Amino acid sequence: MYVVPSLESQKGNNFGSSEKYVRYMGKDSDGLLFDNSGNFVSVDDAYKKIDEHSRGGIRNNEARWYSPVYSFSEDECLHVASLILTNGTIYSRNITTFDDLNQEEKYLYNEKIRELAYNFQDEMAINFNKQNLGINDCKDVLWFGVVENKRYYTGYDSAVINKKAKQGNFKKGFNTHIHIVQSRKALNEKRSLISPMANARAKT
């Protein structure tokens, strides 16, 4: 599993408001994101908190927020699915995509993925190496996340370029990933500037 913290979101640069990116995050989640304490919040609340917290002390040409994406391999997705099946196995039931799970299993699967999100964000907070400033875990960082289980082909995919798939179609198989938006400023007393870019491709 790899984390790729985007310096600049494809949905707009991160020098200004996070609204456009956060609305993109909420498009398939009923407009709800989970926060650093395990609660669900609206898209409006999320981007307003990020924007308000990120004001002041940052130059106009510097990032105010970041958008890490945690992407899982198909084998990792199948492993998580095998942990939550209510009956049978992924092999006996021929589980190959998220849509092969029943409603209860989909809920349990997403819960497991959210648990991993908190683990990954805890590790990121530790890797800032600012424990002396009060940054110890994910609760010391202002962030919001959403789990997505589908990916679409884009014009940049080789399958589209080679005319083996159409742009906009769903990709087959498990495609679970976690979108995160997080403030450049931590939640410690000094609101220290933090950046995941030092570990732009860190294996977790």
Where are the regions that the model predicts?
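N-terminal nicking endonuclease/strand-transfer module with a His-rich metal-binding environment
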Residues: 1-204
